[in-house]
Amino acid sequence: MSDTEYLARAEAVLASVERTVDAANDGDHDIDLERNGSVLTLTFENGSKIIINLQPPMKELWIAAKAGGFHYRFVDGEWRDTRTGTEFFSALTDYATQQAGLPITFRA
């Protein structure tokens, strides 16, 4: 994957996360969302955070959550955990639901 392709795919992920959080905040959620360059920080009512950032040199997306730190690489059309193979949006759904205390579903 070229650098241009990586950036387009990774930026699309961040945009999708932003749209999902905006929609969730229209409902029962209260999630603060801050974007600083290629870093997206979600802060939940209980003060916990999930940080998603781009890693262009490695062509990866990283998630830092209460559950730990996770690296994702684009494989066969999806962002997959480099250790477990878990799909990015599925994992983010689990981490955010745990930290928010309310269900929230992320999709590509």
Swiss-Prot record:
<dbReference type="InterPro" id="IPR047584">
    <property type="entry name" value="CyaY"/>
</dbReference>
<dbReference type="InterPro" id="IPR002908">
    <property type="entry name" value="Frataxin/CyaY"/>
</dbReference>
<dbReference type="GO" id="GO:0005829">
    <property type="term" value="C:cytosol"/>
</dbReference>
<keyword id="KW-0479">Metal-binding</keyword>
<dbReference type="GO" id="GO:0016226">
    <property type="term" value="P:iron-sulfur cluster assembly"/>
</dbReference>
<dbReference type="InterPro" id="IPR020895">
    <property type="entry name" value="Frataxin_CS"/>
</dbReference>
<comment type="function">
    <text>Involved in iron-sulfur (Fe-S) cluster assembly. May act as a regulator of Fe-S biogenesis.</text>
</comment>
<comment type="similarity">
    <text>Belongs to the frataxin family.</text>
</comment>
<dbReference type="Pfam" id="PF01491">
    <property type="entry name" value="Frataxin_Cyay"/>
</dbReference>
<protein>
    <recommendedName>
        <fullName>Iron-sulfur cluster assembly protein CyaY</fullName>
    </recommendedName>
</protein>
<keyword id="KW-0408">Iron</keyword>
<dbReference type="GO" id="GO:0008199">
    <property type="term" value="F:ferric iron binding"/>
</dbReference>
<dbReference type="InterPro" id="IPR036524">
    <property type="entry name" value="Frataxin/CyaY_sf"/>
</dbReference>
<dbReference type="GO" id="GO:0008198">
    <property type="term" value="F:ferrous iron binding"/>
</dbReference>
